[in-house]
Structure formats: C-alpha cells, structure tokens
Amino acid sequence: MGIIAKQSIQGTIVTYLGVAVGFVTTFFVLTRFLSAEEIGLSRVLIDAATLFIGLAQLGTSSSIIRFYPHFRNKEQGTKSQDDHGFFFWTLIVPLVGFALFTAIYCACHEPLSRWFGEKSPLFVEYYYMVLPMAFFMLYQTIFETNANVRMHIVVPRAVRELITRIGLLVVYLLYAFECLTINGFVVALCGVYAVAMLCNMGYLFSLGEIALRPDWEFLRNNRLLIRQYLLYTGFLLISAVASVLAPTLSSFFITAEMGLNYTGIFAIATYIAVMVSIPYRSMT
C-alpha cells in the first residue's frame, strides 16, 4: 500500500473519531450543561477567528500547496534545507496579513460594538479575545499545511480533529462544573488552539525537513516565480472574502440581530448539517 493511500485511510479514521468526540460534546455536554447564550458566545468567537484567519493568511495555505514543488530541491530529497527558505516565507506572509487585519479589526471596534452591543453585549465584552484565538488558529493551519505538502498528514489531522475537540470538551466540562469563570472559559478556549498550534509546530520541527533561513540567492534568480506567487496570492485574497465569509455570515447576523441565545441554537443545528460533509472532509 502506498504512503498516500495509507495516510488517507488513517486520516479518515481520525476524522471519524473526531466526529464522535464532537457528537458527544455537542449533544451530551453543551446542550446539558451550558446555556444557549454560552454556546452562542463560544460559537461566534470561533467563527470570528475563522473569518479573521481566512483573510489574514493572505492565501498562504493554498500558496504552499501550489508553490512548494517549485521551491523544493528535488536533488536533496527531504533534507532540512530542501525548500530554499520557502518555509520562512510561509511564516512571514501570514504574519504581515495578521498585523494588517489586526489594525483593521481594532479600527472597527466602535461600529461593530454598536451593531452587536444591543443584542449580544457579551460578545462585545470579549471582542479582543478573537485576536489571540485567530493567531493560534492561523499558525496551526500554516504548520499543518507545511506538514501535508511534505506527505505527513495523519498527525496534523489528529491535532485538528481529535486533540482540539478533546481540548474543547475538557474546557466545556471544566466550565460546566464551575472550575472556570466565564473569563477563564474564554481564555481556555484560546488555550486549546494555542496547544494545537504548538503540537503542529513541534511535530513539524521534529521531522527535520524545514529550515528558517531564507535563500536570497534563489529569490534573485527566480523573480518570475515570485511575481507568480504574489499574483496568485492576490487572487486568493479576493476569493477568500466570499469563501470564508459565506459560512460564517449567518452566525454574525443572528448574533447581532437576535442575540447569542439564538446563535447557540443555530450552532447546534449547524453541527447536524456539518455531519453530512464528513466524507468530503476526510479527503481534504
């Protein structure tokens, strides 16, 4: 059995295990121990962070998949210096995007607070907690994609589908049994994604297939490739507005116009619909 087929099967198993954890969390923990408003708060924070990283990464995840073969030194196989500093730029580009959209997000605090404030003041209170959560989610994704293009799929998927969900389950239970205040609950949610990011980062560095040093000579000799990369990234940023906004738009409108209680109800209903997409997710 080839490595791709083997990892695909293992990845599918991991995905279904993650679904099982998510099912238990959603239908036996959230609905029993948390109020609709608390469920809604966690949902809208995660949705806001998801929207943020979809824009802030500046198309880096797709660019990694598209351009890594052009940077990889095929003569050296999978040695640590084989990507001509490509990994370095996959860290820098989203960092620039994060800084840019952080400034925009902070500038929008007042108008968004007015929009959400009447029906969902609790979200306004934790408005800035979206930023650290988004940062951790952003680099969790970047590290995962870098591992995937190096044909290491199972562990990053286990982090995304299992470790993250188990971490969220633990946080929900700690809050349910009053081991955490609402402030601690929100901080712990961010902490789950911080742990996931560190797991992916540690795994990627343990492979010994990456280097942080940029290869300036390679960039000077391949300026056309760099222009193609920038053009491709620009198109991805435009398309990300629609592709990332569409799945989260309903959550934001419900939160602003109806309140977090309804967002919580919507989150439970959405999870049922998401289960239909399991076969697709197991292949991505």
Enumerate the predicted regions with their spans.
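Membrane-water interface segments that mark the loop-to-transmembrane alpha-helix transition
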Residues: 6-19, 45, 57-113, 125-128
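Hydrophobic alpha-helical transmembrane segments
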Residues: 128, 159-209, 265-270
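Membrane-interface junctions at transmembrane-helix termini in multi-pass inner-membrane proteins
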Residues: 5, 136-160
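Helix-loop junctions and terminal segments of transmembrane helices
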Residues: 27, 57-74, 149, 269, ...
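Signature of the first transmembrane helix
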Residues: 3-62, 102-106, 133, 231-260, ...
